[in-house]
Amino acid sequence: MVDGLPVEACRIDVWLWRARLTKTRALASTLAAEGRIRLTRAGAQTRLDKASRTVRPGDELVFALAGRVTAVRVLELGLRRGPPAEARALYEPVSAT
């Protein structure tokens, strides 16, 4: 919540950084700009091409980083880059099928 209003969407680079799935926001931006992140929203899959694309709770993301494929479902957007326990509450792992 910001000023009492729920946050509905967040930039993909900011969310990946807050969720501690990437070490830096610049790395998250590069992943998006290179088209290495797939977003599934309401059954439609899209390859992201910009760091400014948004994610919402319920979206699923699939991306490869450090030789490992990661698939997660966005649960919350978060307001900051908190400790690891707080970051893990922002997503849940899903099978990459």
Report the location of each language-model feature:
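Strongly charged
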Residues: 2-18, 29-30, 38-97
